[in-house]
Amino acid sequence: MTLCILTASQKSHALTAHTINIIVGSKPKVVDITAAAKKHGFILNGVFYSSSTHNLSDTNINEFDGFTKLSDFIIKNYTANDLDNSSNYDDAEGDSISHSQPFAVGQTIYQWFDNNGIRIADSDKLNIIGCGSGYAMPLTLTITTSVKTYSEYGNPNESEAVAITKLYKIASKSKLCYAKPYSTESKSGYQWVGINSADGYNWNDPNFSQPNPNNGGGYSVDYVPNWGYKANPAASSGKIFPTTGFSGAKFQLVMTGAQTDYEFSIPVNPGGNVSVDDQGYITLNDKPTGAVTINAKLIRDNNIVHQYTFDVTRMWVVPHNGKYTYDQAVQICNGQDNMLTMADLSNSPRSYDYYNLTSADHISNSYTRKIGDSVFGEWGWVTKNSYPDSNWREDPIDTATFSGRYWTKEINKTDSQWGFVVHSHDGYVVSYSFRLIGSMYNSSYANVVCKK
């Protein structure tokens, strides 16, 4: 066995197995960590992204489609092939890198954090990063691997473990996604209804998402369960939610990421009757005098401003407390012309076929969640409970005492002692006697809602 101690001037000379068997000195080192870390990355939609491949920035925010799930980012396992035997190895005594095992690479570990430094749990990995995710942007993806290197002849020949870590800033592309009626949140279990074969009601049942031509129910393609209406609807003939309104009506503009990533304001507010808070909740306090525009400015980039314009001047309604006869309703509304039609309140098929209310296929009925053609169809379950700042009736204790029945202006042509009411929670349209004919539903008395 030969012991060779090199001076600094000798370090540059090549050492081979012919001249030395063991070199006693310092440990070898893994070097140029910054360059090595650039090879950390992920595969998304079949494309490998990393700093080293120049399609992923390590200094700027990288934006991806908001419908991308965290689980769609397939983190690449770091291997010895990602290290260079020359540039990532150093030995103070000039010993060469081991031929049999140049590097030992540990497990690749990654974590996601939101912009507040809160770690995103593994159970959330199936969540999308965009619309309504609630994640403060940008996210930070941290990828790390422990690496050691080995010299050919050194004693010791194993380096200290070095962490090769890379951080990438990931964000969803900024977007205004949905306009969510407050009832979607406050009465989330009662967003849409379907009429089953037993003439009963099924709430939030996916089997009844399609509107029935005889009974109504379901929702249009513009309504997304749990999120509300699409900000850019496709089936509303260009109408934007809401097109109807009442004092205390409330909805939220749902953005990509966290609501706190945006600053909300109202640059156009004719009449000054609309307000917005820092979470993007818009409240209609009274009837605007024209179209209202809301701005949502991305705080991290003030050049990105989303605008949302709506107009509720076409149909503004005013509900009144108490139960009244039809004649009293006419007086409260200052005339029959200021009362609402069935079709104004509900887009149930019965609203357009109200003289056929007792046919076999026209028993139970309800609204369809849709933009543009009725108050209850747009706003959903409409009571004081679902819109706390409104003047609608409260939810009932039980069905028999339900008080949210609102007179419409129509009178039955074949029997002038019968009118019609619409239920505010489900859009149910039914004929209603002007005379007291029973105690269960307290016929002859109903609630009043007027136009403004």
Task: Please place each PLM-identified region on the residue numbering.
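Acidic, serine/threonine- and proline/glycine-rich low-complexity repeats
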Residues: L3, T7-V276, N285
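Extracellular C-type lectin-like domains
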Residues: V375-K452
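Conserved hydrophobic ligand-interaction patch in extracellular adhesion modules
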Residues: W316-T408
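Extracellular adhesion/carbohydrate-recognition regions
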Residues: W227-S265, N269-L345
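Short, flexible beta-strand-to-coil junctions
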Residues: I109-N116, I299, I411, K452
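Short, structured beta-strand segments at or near domain termini in extracellular proteins/domains
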Residues: G189-N196, G200, N204-P211, Y219, ...
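Short, intrinsically disordered, charge-biased short linear motifs at domain edges
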Residues: G117, V162-I164, V318-G322, L436-I437
